[in-house]
């Protein structure tokens, strides 16, 4: 087959052009074929057709995308040509990368490392490939896709779509979701510098991650029945509504606005809040407030002939307990005022014991209880999970066996945005690089198992040292399962037992160090170039840091006489 062209639309936007250029680049790297990008159907040679082009009829293209949702995509072949289709601009990027990975064999491992096979031919798919993401938005949150440390190309390559890092037009463009400061933003919608002097009653100052910040009284401006008190000229609920309208005027494409409590356990508290919390719980106070805001905003939009928008808020920390009660064995809302409006999204943000998946019978009971009870008062959910110990990034966090269960479980729960929190402020934690690879693939419906995906990453990323990494992981996993069987508590979380001596015997840690040292020897004798050898040794050093850190942290537990 003589491939010569990539056909795009004559008025192709930045997104399509980027996708075509990426396809051209990787076809050349893998096969040596240098394709020309054109907007004219070629008269000779085979071609790729990317999106709606002169090479495909509107009717045929409509059939290709008819069963797709969101950023889904479709790949097919006809008469020796390859057709790449999607419903969205972002989907066209994803379909290009799907072909690059599935048919050319390229693997995007990290923002700094990719695997590119050589001397392969351009492959025609024998059967159509159609994929739709499991979640409308999805991210495994590590530094390579997060804000100032992120890599725009890698965000696109991993099909990451989240709230945290805005993409330019070439990489998919602005999302239809927005919140000031992204999250934890009550105070951003009632600016203290604007209202603080005239209305000090709106605010309390609280401690948030080492800072002192204002938060606001979300009961201010509501009647006892949870409606907006129109007699009050200025109130928190009216201000928030007006500020959201400003955001919608600035970004008319928005579909969801994020309005969420400040981080941590503190909130505005006074006699009125205490009285209402005794009846509705803190979560009920939150729902009543958010209902009032989004209903007010959407009433005005309806009057102006505009579509409704949604509001997202957190079921997090002090507000994670659902505003429900039990009546004759059934979970029911406390009353109708705490039933979430149809345009109110609830985002769970629940810490767990990462040694078990979120849906395991061995998981903390409050998680299953929380998920069940919130369904009595709301219908639209996002989920922010945690796959990290913020206290010790390098401690062995044994959650590899839970990846598939977490992804499948969230899909079954109807979650539409799944954010799995890793170490967002660094790219360099070896365990999370592996799990991120598997999670990101599964988010988009990869047919392989999480175990196959983690093994693929390790083999490609660590080269001759791969078996030593697998050995270390097996050493830790075996030790933790034996500790569990012996009745010890195994927890992977902030300050979990995975950091401690009781489930990390000194002898086990030294055996883990020895495993990596054998890997280092294997790398040195593998005959790689000096640069590649040093790269692999540096990666293994990052893995070896885990048992070394645990030996250091727990030295006095192993050797209480050590200070002598």
Language-model regions: role of each:
Residues 290-325, 381-388, 418-421:
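Aromatic-lined carbohydrate-recognition surfaces of secreted/lumenal glycan-active proteins
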Residues 312-350, 394-399, 428-435:
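Substrate-binding cleft/loops of secretory-pathway carbohydrate-active enzymes
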Residues 139, 254-258, 308-312, 343-347, ...:
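Structural preference for beta-strand elements that scaffold enzyme active sites
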